[in-house]
Amino acid sequence: MPLKMAVYPGSFDPVTYGHLDIIDRGLKIFDGVIVAVARNSEKNALFSVQERIELLTEILKDRPEARVETFDGLLVDYVRRVGASVIIRGLRAVSDFEFEFQLAQMNRNITRDVETLFMMTSVPYSYLSSSIVKEVSCLNGPVDKLVPPLVKSALDAKFRG
């Protein structure tokens, strides 16, 4: 029986505990999860694509069923190319749903071979976003409960040299 793979795409700028929650829950459903760092979301990025890949790879090193890759272009093309059939998307609030629903419908319009699975974030992460993390860290606020220690160190290096 072939492995059932899913793709969890995002900018991950930076990766948060909310992202890791979705990855871990995805790994309970699928044989493997490809964490796909989007190359075409560079505008206003704090971390380069390479830095994000390195952070994610180190953080996920104890999760062999998760692998980190990068992609550009249409997500559904990438998903088909890597042999996956499901896109995982995390939803924090109802406000996320409308945009994500539109993307899922467009992807479905492009191909019927790829499904989108929406996962509600766990309650502790329902407000969490990479943008909030960057804002709080930039202002020297505490982000210890929002991101792994490696990411906190990387944020400190960016904002405080």
Curated annotation (Swiss-Prot):
Pfam families in alphabetical order: CTP_transf_like
Entry's EC annotation: 2.7.7.3
Alphabetically ordered keywords of this record: ATP-binding, Coenzyme A biosynthesis, Cytoplasm, Magnesium, Nucleotide-binding, Nucleotidyltransferase, Transferase
Catalysed reactions listed for this entry: (R)-4'-phosphopantetheine + ATP + H(+) = 3'-dephospho-CoA + diphosphate
Binding site for ATP: S11, F12, H19, G90, L91, R92, E100, Y125, S126, Y127, L128, S129, S130, S131
Biological process, per Gene Ontology: coenzyme A biosynthetic process
Site (Transition state stabilizer): H19
Binding-site list for substrate: S11, K43, L75, R89
Source taxon at top rank: Bacteria
Single GO MF descriptor: pantetheine-phosphate adenylyltransferase activity
Cofactor(s) required for function per UniProt: Mg(2+)
The keyword rRNA-binding appears for this protein: no
Enzyme class: transferase
Gene Ontology cellular component annotations, sorted alphabetically: cytoplasm
Pathway(s) served: Cofactor biosynthesis; coenzyme A biosynthesis; CoA from (R)-pantothenate: step 4/5
Stored InterPro entries: Cyt_trans-like (IPR004821), PPAT (IPR001980), Rossmann-like_a/b/a_fold (IPR014729)
Subcellular location: Cytoplasm
Quaternary structure note: Homohexamer.
Function: Reversibly transfers an adenylyl group from ATP to 4'-phosphopantetheine, yielding dephospho-CoA (dPCoA) and pyrophosphate.
UniProt record similarity statement: Belongs to the bacterial CoaD family.
HAMAP family: PPAT_bact (MF_00151)
Protein name listed in UniProt: Phosphopantetheine adenylyltransferase
